[in-house]
């Protein structure tokens, strides 16, 4: 019987099957950061338990760490306590890898794991963070979990899960100039909606997806949760294997050969049946910009802000009206006439070396517009930062008027010093544009790194295809 990739991943990890369709699944990799782990470790201690398999753990602080003035430490007392608690917990119990604050390898977990080869095809990967779906780029069954589940995985190395339906999102054809994985992700969400993937595990396929680099695939899978799906993944191919070879925690020698032989089975079989299939033409996808307070509120950069009056569904119409009021926008305003205040290039969605190269290629020889108050470039990890500096990208950003920062989650979310002030509008390469996501009253527009760079130069949203 032909199987989907999801079928294979699920069946390979079932420890016990319940009659109601739920199953106890074994967890291969547990990623831990400072925000969702303190209560879990405390629960273990109160119960007199120890972690079941510390060799599954990869940990680093990322949400609360500052991205500048590291010599001053972490000023906010709550943030400092969370980071210090993570440090104490991991030093007590151990881990496969721990990259503490100021370690040259620290950074955003969803960047650090893959670049170190700690995310390998066929794994189940969990983390107390909703964007764990990023790791699905490696044909992993990866998803976010809550704090109580973090404790459960620490104690048992298992999770009780209900099987999802399957969806294939196929993007066929060749992407045009200036169109990136981020644009593909936003176009998909704009097509299926933020609830379109609810209850599904999404496999991304098609010639355009196969043409993406691993970093592009990570961007795509990172956004799966924004389409309602806990899981998003891409089948293994030569691109996957070539990326992993020689990474610190990748297998070596004969073990590598055996691993590769297994990894090459991690694809949907010919004739495998999906519960839903969605197909997009790559040629139809243009650079995207969100206009509202949900990732599904997105249009092409050459479009206008939608008019709620044209929406027949009263619930959707009301949501659009509220979003426009919060965002301070009027219907039918051309996207390329919307001025910005700040620019953020970073986050677990778009802070890898290819993202920084992409933005730098637009910025080189140009400068941030006078109306832009702040432009941040925040590498996703210390390793990415060092690579970018070796290539001279930091000099390009600084010459263009950007601040070149230390690694961390930064302005993706208002849990550290990098945030928007009320009413400020930001071109952001992050993954969520909810009300207050980047700071109370802040207005977030999601774009690709290239589009963020183009907006920084113009002082408003601009079509990056015109400057490439």
Curated annotation (Swiss-Prot):
Binding site for [4Fe-4S] cluster: 348, 409, 412
Top EC category: lyase
Cofactor binding, per record: Binds 1 [4Fe-4S] cluster per subunit.
Associated pathway: Amino-acid biosynthesis; L-leucine biosynthesis; L-leucine from 3-methyl-2-oxobutanoate: step 2/4
Pfam families in the record: Aconitase
Catalytic activity entry: (2R,3S)-3-isopropylmalate = (2S)-2-isopropylmalate
Protein EC: 4.2.1.33
Keywords: 4Fe-4S, Amino-acid biosynthesis, Branched-chain amino acid biosynthesis, Iron, Iron-sulfur, Leucine biosynthesis, Lyase, Metal-binding
GO terms under biological process: L-leucine biosynthetic process
Cofactor(s) of this protein: [4Fe-4S] cluster
GO molecular function, one term: metal ion binding
SUPFAM superfamilies hit by this protein: Aconitase iron-sulfur domain
Domain of life: Bacteria
Protein family membership: Belongs to the aconitase/IPM isomerase family. LeuC type 1 subfamily.
Function: Catalyzes the isomerization between 2-isopropylmalate and 3-isopropylmalate, via the formation of 2-isopropylmaleate.
PANTHER family: 3-ISOPROPYLMALATE DEHYDRATASE, HOMOACONITASE, MITOCHONDRIAL-RELATED
Record note on quaternary structure: Heterodimer of LeuC and LeuD.
UniProt-recorded name of the protein: 3-isopropylmalate dehydratase large subunit
This protein's encoding gene: leuC
């Amino acid at each position: 019987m032909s199987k989907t990739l999801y079928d294979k991943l699920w069946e390979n990890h079932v420890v016990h099957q319940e009659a109601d369709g739920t199953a106890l699944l074994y967890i291969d990799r547990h990623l831990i950061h400072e925000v969702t782990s303190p209560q879990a470790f405390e629960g273990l201690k109160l119960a007199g338990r120890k972690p079941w398999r510390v060799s599954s753990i990869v940990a680093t602080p990322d949400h609360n760490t500052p991205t500048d003035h590291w010599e001053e430490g972490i000023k906010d007392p709550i943030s400092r306590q969370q980071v210090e608690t993570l440090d104490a917990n991991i030093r007590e119990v151990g881990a496969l890898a721990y990259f503490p604050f100021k370690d040259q390898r620290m950074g955003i977990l969803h960047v650090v794991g893959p670049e170190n080869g700690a995310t390998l095809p066929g794994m189940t990967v969990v983390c107390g963070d909703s964007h764990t779906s990023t790791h699905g780029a490696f044909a992993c069954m990866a998803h976010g979990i809550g704090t109580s589940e973090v404790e459960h995985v620490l104690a048992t190395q298992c999770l009780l899960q209900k099987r999802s339906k399957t969806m294939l999102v196929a993007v066929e054809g060749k992407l045009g100039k200036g169109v990136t994985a981020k644009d593909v992700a936003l176009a998909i969400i704009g097509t299926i909606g933020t609830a379109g993937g609810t209850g599904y595990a999404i496999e991304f396929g098609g010639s355009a997806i196969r043409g993406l680099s691993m970093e592009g695939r990570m961007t795509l899978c990172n956004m799966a949760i924004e389409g309602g799906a806990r899981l998003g993944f891409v089948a293994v191919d030569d691109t996957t294997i070539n990326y992993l070879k020689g990474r610190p925690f990748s297998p070596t020698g004969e073990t590598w050969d055996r691993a590769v032989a297994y990894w090459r089975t991690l694809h949907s079989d010919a004739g495998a049946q999906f519960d839903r299939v969605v197909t997009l033409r790559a040629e139809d996808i243009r650079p995207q910009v969100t206009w509202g307070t949900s990732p599904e509120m997105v249009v092409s950069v050459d479009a206008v802000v939608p008019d709620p009056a044209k929406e027949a569904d009263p619930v959707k119409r009301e949501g659009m009206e509220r979003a426009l009021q919060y965002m301070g926008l009027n219907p039918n305003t051309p996207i390329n006439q919307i001025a910005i205040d700040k620019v953020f290039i970073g986050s677990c969605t778009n802070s890898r070396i290819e993202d920084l190269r992409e933005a730098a290629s637009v910025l080189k020889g140009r400068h941030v517009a006078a109306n832009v108050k702040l432009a941040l470039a925040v590498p996703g990890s210390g390793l990415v930062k060092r690579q970018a500096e070796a290539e001279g990208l930091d000099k390009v950003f600084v010459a263009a008027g950007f601040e070149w920062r230390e690694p961390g989650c930064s302005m993706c979310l208002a849990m550290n010093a990098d945030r928007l002030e009320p009413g400020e509008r930001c071109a952001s390469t992050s993954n969520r544009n909810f009300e207050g996501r980047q700071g109370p009253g802040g207005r977030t527009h999601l774009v690709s790194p290239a589009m963020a760079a183009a907006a920084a130069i113009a002082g408003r949203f601009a079509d990056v295809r015109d400057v490439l």
